[in-house]
């Protein structure tokens, strides 16, 4: 399962607690199908409707892919009529410019909350969506990730042995260029008529641009 989650072109050997990987060095080519994205989107949509509130969290020191994907999901969830917030604790240089654009629009006044505010909002029906990370050591706030029972992981990095446990959905797609690309695809299946604003689209595009190194890496169709 771990080998398949990392792309399938490798062997995994576990010796006691030590895990070694052999292979997995081939160039990652497009192997995804839209069927899986459609199924995941439908499952995600149902979980959102079953939730009292939704929190979104990325990795430590979030970059444009993590934050752009978060904003895209936030927009889709709000269009489904549910309460949603993105957990951000500190000002991050990598996303300062985009963050300031969001802050200049009153639509996004309640977009962000701190970890301490998020902990107060947690209840049995809270759903946590973890984006652009699945490793316990890199998630923004492991305490929150472990405290919330209902959680989903959306990520494009090769699967780590130290994965956050207990997720209702693990959507880890190593052939995607970025988490922002994955979220963009999910949105079109989550909503009948998506209404993504210019600034939200810029965030998703910025995430894809960053992780493809200016559309030079993993940008084939």
Predicted regions located by residue number:
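Short acidic, glycine/serine/threonine-rich loops at helix termini
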Residues: 22-26, 67-69, 97-100, 141-143, ...
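Active-site cofactor/cluster-binding pocket
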Residues: 112-166
């Amino acid at each position: 399962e771990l080998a398949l989650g990392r792309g399938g072109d490798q062997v995994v050997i576990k010796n006691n607690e030590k895990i070694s990987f052999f292979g997995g060095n081939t160039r990652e080519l497009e192997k995804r199908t839209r069927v899986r994205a459609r199924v995941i989107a439908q499952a995600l949509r149902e979980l959102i409707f079953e939730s009292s509130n939704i929190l979104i969290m990325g990795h430590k020191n979030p970059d444009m892919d993590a934050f752009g994907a978060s904003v895209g999901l936030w927009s889709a969830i709000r269009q489904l009529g549910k309460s949603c917030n993105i957990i951000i604790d500190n000002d991050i240089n990598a996303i300062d410019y985009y963050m300031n654009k969001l802050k200049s629009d009153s639509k996004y006044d309640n977009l962000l909350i701190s970890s301490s505010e998020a902990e107060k909002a947690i209840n049995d029906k809270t759903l946590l969506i973890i984006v652009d990370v699945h490793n316990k050591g890199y998630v923004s706030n492991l305490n929150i990730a472990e405290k919330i029972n209902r959680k989903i992981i959306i990520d494009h990095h090769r699967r780590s042995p130290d994965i956050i446990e207990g997720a209702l959905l693990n959507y880890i797609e190593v052939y995607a260029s970025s988490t922002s690309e994955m979220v963009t695809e999910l949105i079109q299946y989550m909503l009948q008529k998506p209404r993504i604003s210019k600034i939200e689209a810029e965030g998703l595009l910025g995430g894809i641009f960053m992780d493809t190194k200016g559309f030079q890496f993993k940008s084939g169709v």
